[in-house]
């Protein structure tokens, strides 16, 4: 059953490659002609472990096609996914221009029934706007062609997206017709055959599910960061607290790690949009407002520790920042805690050297010549007054601490992810962590 996916960004390309690997013929559509040409030339525009090989396999099997035209691919498919971006407006609400532009293009070009599935993260009620937009485009053409809309939100974690797609905790599908349900059941048959859960529900519930899931995870992170800050004040250890509460089966241990705040393309944007949606319906989410405020403050914790250590005497100090992406196994620096830290350091007059195993090209794009780009952790640490550990890449876990101790000016290690134990201390470093 051929399908089309419009919007070949992170979600769209991963979904397309995975569907193709399951035997589905996929037409990938994006208005960015340069991106489509790069894909045709075999270049992958995003970093995700295993994605290059998966895309190549799909192309070689003849199951992945690339186009810039919705009208060109519509005659070949019965299901068309919209996976375009929904960036936040100034007020935090999701910008639906791209989603509705896709809907309009479908309404202008469709000649036969199709199921229009929104995979983008969108506010509740978006499916009604998509339906109205397609109907309006048809009216302008003087036609009335049947179609259905559905919601199929993604739950992919950057760095583990292929595994998440192929072996999901669940697949959420929102439909409002038997035909739409039957088509989505056929599409996800390989998932069902492997005994993974496909949960059908109404469309509004599916749209809320995505926001609620990310908001819940963000809440756990901010809660543990609040606990960590209290632990520091009273002399407790947040790692011990995490073990104590995480062993409770009702709570579990996932997303209970304190640190220097969350970032990325999902949590900050989705929490803001969920807050905005709730306000529009007269149901303010005060818990999420606090979650957001806590996270904003937490991104300043590492700089505050550094400033206290030196009594505010920071001008001219050299520092190293390890980890620039918002999490390991990605080059995504959107809303990354590293950016807040680096900006604070530069404003204080510090000289900053940075290193990340993957995100250096993205860092150059964002930071320009304001920082020094190190070759590795050892190069970054030459004659510095502090090393900041911001992203928990495995490559940072076991460096030669004795070598680093001889390289630095001041043996200060500020660990924003609480991953180091006694090794740096035994080598002579002062270790500052969060909540312990």
List each model region and its residues.
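Structural/interface elements that position substrates and couple domains in central-metabolism enzymes
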Residues: 1-436
